[in-house]
Amino acid sequence: GMVYILGDVGMRGKKEELIAFVAQLKGRKVLIKGNHDDVSDYRYQQLFHEICDYKEMHDTIGKEHYSLVLSHYPIFSWRNMGRGRILLYGHTHESEEDRFYQKCLSEMRANDCRHVYEAEELRAYNVGCMRDYMNYTPRTLEEILNSRRKV
């Protein structure tokens, strides 16, 4: 299947080690570039099915269809955010910056005087690999959505 990597694969380490590491990962890989990703090496580029800055896509869990935005960075406004489209992002780790971002989204939900978010919950998930529920392991969309329900 497809494996979506939301950036900063090459944050540390030598280029040869990075190429060897990514080459051993299973699945067809899509890299959503982060601020620490150097994709100038042709050998590295060839390891990915696609390399992009931002991706809009759909996924299905059973009979449920999900509309998604994949970005390395957390963003405050994404297409159809008030119509159920879910943002998956990384970059912020488990930082004060991420807590501030999530607080801002909560304020947007609570103070929605235009009722933009009324029909669907505004959802953005930090899927950084260092998060407890990610544990440096690829996760399915279902696992990501269920992890938030447990919190």
Where does each model-flagged region fall?
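N-terminal active-site segment of His-dependent metallophosphoesterases
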Residues: 1-17, 121-132, 146-151
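Core catalytic region of metal-dependent phosphoesterases/phosphodiesterases
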Residues: 1-56
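Active-site neighborhood of phospho(di)ester-bond hydrolases with catalytic His/Asp-centered motifs
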Residues: 3-8, 29-35, 70-71, 87-93, ...
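Active-site environment of divalent metal-dependent phosphoester hydrolases
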Residues: 10-16, 35-42, 76-81, 88-100, ...
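A short, conserved beta-to-alpha structural element at the edge of catalytic cores
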Residues: 27-44, 118, 123-148
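Flexible, gly/pro- and Lys/Arg-enriched active-site loops
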Residues: 52-56, 96-129
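Beta-strand-turn-beta hairpins that frame and shape the catalytic cleft
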Residues: 58-68, 120-123
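Short, motif-level signal for alpha-helix interfacial/capping segments enriched in acidic residues
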Residues: 64-82
